[in-house]
C-alpha cells in the first residue's frame, strides 16, 4: 500500500488547496501563475458512496493484486458473513472521475461510508476488525 508522504511534499513546495473530511488532501505545485487550479470533483466530497447497505469496493487495474483480492478474497469473506458486496471496477477515465473516491486503485465503503484505500482490508483479520 503506497500513499505519498504529505509532510515531505509540503516541505518541497507543494500547497494543500483542498482537504476532504475523510483525510484526502489535494496538493499542488504550480509552475505558472495562470495555471488552472485543480479541485476535487463534487462526487468525492461527502466521503460516502450511493450504496448504503453492506460493502462496496471500487477498484481499477492500476495494481496487479487488486483484482485477486477484491474478486477472490473479499467476495469469500463477505459471503461467509452474509454481507452484501458490490464490486465496481473502474475501467474508464470517466468512471474514475465520477466515482465517490479520489483513490481509484482501491477504495472500500461500508454501509455507505468510506473506510480505507488499504487493500490489506481484504485479509481475514483486518476484515473482521472492520466489522466490529
Walk through the language-model features, giving the residues of each:
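Non-catalytic substrate-recognition and accessory regions of acyl/acetyltransferase enzymes
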Residues: 19, 28-32, 79-81, 98-99
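Local sequence-structure signature of Cys/Sec-based thiol-disulfide redox active-site neighborhoods
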Residues: 42-80
